[in-house]
């Protein structure tokens, strides 16, 4: 059976950048550490889930492109500050993962999260999403699971209520009522 690993690229590089920053005790350059931790994380996911295919979905837009949601709703993610530092090694990381046989996927004007949802809908076989973003819980079903690398938790339909504190059928309704504090 086909199994596709879908990795949230922005979430991954941001998390591994913070790990590299904590490990860099002498305040020297940490590009090598960041690249190492990122590639090591990807390798550990491939070993853990043994996919037939791995795809890293990135949030990057070209300079002339804008996010469709921000064009429609100027307040979208207005409370978030963008820190370019965690993304300084993206080009090197992307080249290296391609050499290792992983596909880089660039959504252009869309959010990487939306593209992961699209890929989950359109790819055959089982999909494992790797991200610390809890919004992906809404995608979990009989052919999609979510692995949170921060908490080291794997959520499937069978343990969904333990992770989300509600039944799967109620999850979207509860999310709509609560809203998203980070946005």
Name each model feature, range by range:
Residues 2-130, 136-146, 150-153:
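Noncatalytic, basic helical substrate-engagement surface that gates or grips nucleic-acid strands
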Residues 154-183:
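Feature 3881 marks metal-assisted phosphotransfer/nuclease machinery
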């Amino acid at each position: 059976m086909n199994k596709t690993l879908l990795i949230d690229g922005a979430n991954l590089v941001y998390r591994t950048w913070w790990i590299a920053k904590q490990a860099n005790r002498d305040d020297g350059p940490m590009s090598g550490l960041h690249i190492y931790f990122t590639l090591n994380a990807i390798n550990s996911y491939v070993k853990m889930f043994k996919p037939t295919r791995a795809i890293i979905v990135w949030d990057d837009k070209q300079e002339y492109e804008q996010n469709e949601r921000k064009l429609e709703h100027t307040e979208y993610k207005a409370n978030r500050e963008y820190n370019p530092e965690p993304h300084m090694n993206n080009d090197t990381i992307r080249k290296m993962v391609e050499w290792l046989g992983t596909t880089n996927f660039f959504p252009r004007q869309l959010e990487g999260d939306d593209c992961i949802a699209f890929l989950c809908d359109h790819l055959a076989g089982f999909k494992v999403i790797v991200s610390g973003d809890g919004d992906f819980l809404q995608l979990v079903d009989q052919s999609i699971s979510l692995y949170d690398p921060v908490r080291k938790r794997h959520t499937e339909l069978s343990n969904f209520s333990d992770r989300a504190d509600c039944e799967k059928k109620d999850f979207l309704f509860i999310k709509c009522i609560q809203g998203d504090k980070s946005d």
